[in-house]
């Protein structure tokens, strides 16, 4: 008898394969960065195109022109509406206090139903002063920014997404000063991200609903003679007689897609402003002929990210500086782009 070879179908690393709790992705781990800056940004996926550029990464094609698929993520400025301070608790970080800005856009009420009432400029300054005292006393161990998106600037929708971003650096006082300067103001992507650096992309994937084990796990379709008795796109059996239960490792039908995923080390090729990219000294519109399918025209700032990005068009995409970059990494500078495809994607 020949050797039986049946590799494991699909990965158990992502189990249970269920729908994400929220379409807004969460970031649990932040990279260590000596620069005092907001560690990441957020935008909306527009679509894909391709470019030609001179390869500056270490390898066989260095110095040669290469073809690179890229994803365009529109990133209107984020608004800093608050500061969140953390203290050291028994089991980890605990929220010590928050300070919210007193003048917020009316659209924020669509997302946050519990905005404080009778909260004016004097109250804001008083709470900010109390937080500064806590920082000076050494009770605060970390300071982070509370931001919300502004999708109405790109005519996408009115309800914003709210999220939290860490601040780089080691000094808590420097972090607080950074947050104090920016609360109540907008932050653009070019202020916190650098062209050419590696990013981690966090998003929720496209939802595909309920799918069978063949598409969901990659199991083989039954032999054609075995299909005569009934069906072929199913597993041969659910497991042994004992233990008398179905193991969780058995590939079965169920939810596929709309999963929370992180993709590491995507290079930020370029950052554009107001829908335009500087190419060979000239400004060009990044929007292809006829617009991006199911999205439209790029009106604000955008990121050009190498490769694909999880999620559907118009979905919120979050990025952060790479948390585990490779040893051989490209220089943190914009590569020389020779061509950008703006042909119709229809």
Swiss-Prot record:
Q: Which Gene3D superfamilies match?
A: 3.30.1430.10, Ribosomal protein L3, domain 3, Translation factors
Ordered alphabetically, the record's keywords are: Ribonucleoprotein, Ribosomal protein, RNA-binding, rRNA-binding
Question: Which superkingdom heads the taxonomic lineage of this protein's source?
Answer: Archaea
An example GO CC term for this entry is: cytosolic large ribosomal subunit
Annotated function: One of the primary rRNA binding proteins, it binds directly near the 3'-end of the 23S rRNA, where it nucleates assembly of the 50S subunit.
Tell me which family the UniProt entry assigns to this protein: Belongs to the universal ribosomal protein uL3 family.
Subunit-structure text: Part of the 50S ribosomal subunit. Forms a cluster with proteins L14 and L24e.
Signal peptide annotation? none
Q: Where is this region: Disordered?
A: 324-346
Gene Ontology BP term (one): translation
**What is the recorded name of this protein?**
Large ribosomal subunit protein uL3
Q: Which gene encodes it?
A: rpl3
Pfam families found in the cross-reference section: Ribosomal_L3 (PF00297)
Does the record carry Iron-sulfur as a key word?
no
* Sample GO molecular function, one term: structural constituent of ribosome
């Amino acid at each position: 008898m020949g050797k039986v070879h049946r590799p494991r179908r699909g990965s158990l690393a992502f189990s249970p394969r269920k729908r994400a709790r929220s379409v807004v992705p969460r970031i649990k781990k932040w990279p260590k960065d000596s620069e005092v800056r907001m560690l990441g940004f957020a935008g909306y996926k527009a679509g894909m195109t391709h470019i030609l550029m001179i390869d500056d990464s270490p390898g066989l094609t260095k110095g040669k022109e290469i073809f690179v698929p890229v994803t365009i993520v529109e990133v209107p400025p984020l608004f800093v509406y608050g500061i969140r301070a953390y203290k050291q608790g028994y089991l980890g970080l605990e929220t010590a206090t928050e300070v919210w800005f007193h003048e917020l856009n009316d659209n924020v009420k669509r997302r946050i139903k519990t905005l404080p009432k009778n909260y004016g400029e004097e109250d804001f300054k008083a709470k900010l002063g109390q937080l500064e005292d806590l920082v000076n006393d050494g009770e605060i161990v970390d300071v982070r920014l509370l931001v919300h998106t502004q999708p109405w600037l790109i005519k996408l929708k009115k309800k914003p997404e709210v999220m939290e971003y860490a601040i780089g650096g080691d000094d808590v006082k420097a972090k607080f000063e950074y947050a104090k300067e920016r609360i109540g103001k907008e932050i653009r992507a070019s202020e916190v991200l650098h062209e050419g650096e590696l990013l981690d992309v966090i998003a929720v994937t496209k939802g595909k609903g309920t799918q069978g084990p063949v598409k969901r796990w990659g199991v083989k379709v039954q032999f054609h003679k075995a299909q005569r008795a009934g069906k072929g796109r199913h597993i041969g059996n659910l497991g042994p007689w004992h233990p008398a239960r179905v193991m969780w490792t058995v590939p079965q039908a169920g939810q596929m897609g709309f999963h929370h995923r992180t993709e590491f080390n995507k290079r930020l090729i370029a950052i554009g402003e107001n829908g335009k990219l500087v190419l060979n000294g000239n400004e060009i519109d990044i929007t292809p002929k006829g617009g991006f399918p199911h999205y439209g025209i790029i009106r604000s700032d955008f990121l050009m990210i190498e490769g694909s990005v999880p999620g559907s068009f118009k979905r919120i995409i979050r990025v952060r500086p790479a948390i585990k970059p490779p040893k051989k990494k490209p220089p943190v500078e914009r590569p020389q782009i020779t061509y950008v495809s703006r042909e119709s994607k229809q």
